[in-house]
């Protein structure tokens, strides 16, 4: 009876994906997941976990959700597969409101939405093969089809040689690969990642991110992830939203948000990735100049790779590069430079105006003698 009801659902089960080496880019004109005025208040809590969320997630993109602890990240993520029921507003998937779905239609929906977690949730008494196969057995998939699918997925995640191994014999990264394979058994269109790399070391994290990027590219999945690791967002996401106390405070392309964060919460979250002064120079910074010959210290956030000699000449005086670097996010070169400017004919206000002609964001860090 459940299968018959699922077939009548307005959102049909996804057709099996066919792997392709062609990169699939997000469709900028199509919202795969849409939040409209979304709110969530838990019983006994005066402060809503989510409030007034209006947000689109594009089909085929990797979308990041960041924020401080308690900002509402997990609550928002779990409304997509209705593990959390919103108190207000709507969640639309392919323009269909999922709020009225009965149990049968929810089953059909959740088979289209895979999910991986920080903790791998593998069954210790079952092999890698059996862990991946289990959801297919529960769904009543025929044995031949189960074998084909499990074999295909273990090859995709690089575990073909580990199919008869038990979880206790696997590394953390290998366990997460099993979790990813299991999340893909029903050919989902959306993959939710809840702190999927936070229990892994940096090298293993990099390999899991590359796997997620490959899955997104080859299968065209929409990937939505939450993480407290800003480097993960920088390395893999197309766009990002910043939550604070259940509300959206900033959103946009990752290179734009990371290159010139506007909200104080975003700046705080990104601080570990920011270029910093050496401690010896930091200790000598003053809020105001101690003498007429004191240098002003500026931090410039740049998009692209400017001609430094022209920049220095434009600022006037004696310009010294104290710290800096350029990295690529997506297809965009982003740089941060910390400069000291001494003896410029321009005052601090004029220096800031001149520097803003070169940089997306300029900050006065202080003055040094």
Curated annotation (Swiss-Prot):
Positions contributing to ATP binding: 67-74
Gene3D superfamilies in alphabetical order: 3.30.70.260, P-loop containing nucleotide triphosphate hydrolases
Topology in the lipid bilayer: Peripheral membrane protein
GO MF assignments: ABC-type D-methionine transporter activity; ATP binding; ATP hydrolysis activity
Superkingdom as given in the UniProt entry: Bacteria
Positions of the ABC transporter domain: 33-270
Compartment(s): Cell inner membrane
Catalysed conversion reaction: L-methionine(out) + ATP + H2O = L-methionine(in) + ADP + phosphate + H(+); D-methionine(out) + ATP + H2O = D-methionine(in) + ADP + phosphate + H(+)
Region (Disordered): 1-22
EC number: 7.4.2.11
GO CC, alphabetical: plasma membrane
Keyword set, alphabetical order: Amino-acid transport, ATP-binding, Cell inner membrane, Cell membrane, Membrane, Nucleotide-binding, Translocase, Transport
Description of how the protein assembles with itself and partners: The complex is composed of two ATP-binding proteins (MetN), two transmembrane proteins (MetI) and a solute-binding protein (MetQ).
Family in the record: Belongs to the ABC transporter superfamily. Methionine importer (TC 3.A.1.24) family.
General function of this protein: Part of the ABC transporter complex MetNIQ involved in methionine import. Responsible for energy coupling to the transport system.
Protein name: Methionine import ATP-binding protein MetN 1
Organism (species): Pseudomonas entomophila (strain L48)
Gene from which this protein is expressed: metN1
């Amino acid at each position: 009876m459940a299968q018959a009801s699922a077939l009548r659902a307005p959102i049909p089960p996804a057709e099996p994906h066919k792997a392709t080496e062609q990169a699939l880019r997000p469709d900028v004109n199509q919202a795969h997941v849409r939040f409209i005025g979304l709110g969530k208040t838990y019983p006994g809590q005066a402060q809503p976990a989510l409030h007034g969320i209006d947000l689109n997630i594009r089909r085929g993109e990797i979308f990041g959700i960041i924020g401080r602890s308690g900002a509402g990240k997990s609550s928002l993520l779990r409304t997509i597969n209705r593990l959390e029921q919103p108190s207000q507003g709507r969640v639309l998937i392919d323009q269909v409101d999922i709020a009225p779905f009965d149990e049968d239609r929810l089953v059909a929906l959740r088979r289209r939405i895979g999910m991986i977690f920080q903790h791998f949730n593998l069954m210790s008494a079952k092999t890698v093969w059996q862990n991946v196969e289990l959801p297919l057995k529960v769904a009543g998939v025929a044995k031949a089809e189960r074998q084909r699918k499990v074999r295909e997925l273990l090859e995709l995640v690089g575990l073909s040689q580990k199919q008869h191994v038990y979880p206790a014999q696997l590394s953390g990264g290998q366990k997460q690969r099993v979790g990813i394979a299991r999340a893909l058994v029903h050919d989902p269109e959306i993959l939710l990642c809840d702190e999927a790399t936070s229990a892994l070391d940096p090298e293993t994290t990099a390999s899991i991110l590359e796997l997620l990027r490959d899955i997104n590219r080859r299968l065209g999945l929409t990937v939505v992830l939450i993480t407290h690791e800003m480097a993960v967002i920088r390395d893999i996401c197309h766009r990002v939203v910043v939550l604070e106390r259940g509300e959206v405070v900033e959103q946009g392309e990752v290179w734009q948000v990371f290159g010139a964060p506007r909200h104080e919460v975003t700046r705080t979250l990104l601080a570990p990735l920011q270029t910093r002064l050496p401690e010896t120079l930091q200790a000598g910074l003053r809020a105001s100049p101690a003498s007429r010959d004191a240098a002003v210290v500026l931090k410039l956030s740049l998009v692209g790779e400017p001609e430094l000699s022209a920049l220095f000449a434009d600022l006037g005086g004696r310009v010294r590069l104290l710290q800096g670097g350029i990295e690529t996010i997506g297809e965009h070169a982003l740089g941060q430079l910390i400069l000291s400017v001494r003896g410029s004919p321009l005052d601090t206000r004029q220096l800031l105006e001149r520097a803003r002609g070169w940089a997306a964001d300029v900050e006065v860090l202080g003055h040094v003698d």
